[in-house]
Swiss-Prot record:
Its main location: secreted. Keywords: Disulfide bond, Ion channel impairing toxin, Knottin, Neurotoxin, Pharmaceutical, Potassium channel impairing toxin, Secreted, Signal, Toxin, Voltage-gated potassium channel impairing toxin, Voltage-gated sodium channel impairing toxin. GO terms for molecular function: ion channel inhibitor activity; potassium channel regulator activity; sodium channel regulator activity; toxin activity. InterPro entries: Huwentoxin-1. The lineage of its organism: Eukaryota, Metazoa, Ecdysozoa, Arthropoda, Chelicerata. It comes from Chilobrachys guangxiensis. This is Mu-theraphotoxin-Cg1a. Negative results: does not inhibit TTX-resistant sodium currents on rat dorsal root ganglion (DRG) neurons. Has no activity on voltage-gated potassium channel Kv2.1/KCNB1 expressed in frog oocytes. Does not show activity towards Nav1.1/SCN1A, Nav1.2/SCN2A, Nav1.4/SCN4A, Nav1.5/SCN5A, Nav1.6/SCN8A, Nav1.8/SCN10A sodium channel. Disulfide bonds join C52-C66, C59-C71, C65-C79. The presence of a 'disulfide through disulfide knot' structurally defines this protein as a knottin.
Length: 87
């Protein structure tokens, strides 16, 4: 019984390795180095431009700042916390 379980586990392990290798071969290793793949990764990690200014970002009015921030009334004008904590 123990031998049968060990043989079954060995066969399942071999099948896993074989299917993983076949899948890798199907995709191709050069796909990871292709310019299209690099461009898609750049697009994913590209910083998004926000419609509002973050903390200490320059502003001219309160609407320029993100939620829970307001534009400082005196020079230098930048976004500061408005002392609110609600969502």
């Amino acid at each position: 019984m123990k031998v049968l379980v060990l043989i079954t586990l060995a066969v399942l392990g071999a099948m896993f390795v074989w299917t993983s290798a076949a899948e890798l071969e199907e995709r191709g290793s050069d796909q990871r180095d292709s310019p299209a793949w690099v461009k898609s990764m750049e697009r994913i990690f590209q910083s998004e431009e926000r419609a509002c200014r973050e903390w200490l970002g320059g502003c001219s009015k309160d609407a320029d700042c993100c939620a829970h921030l307001e534009c400082r009334k005196k020079w230098p004008y930048h976004c500061v916390w408005d002392w609110t904590v609600r969502k």
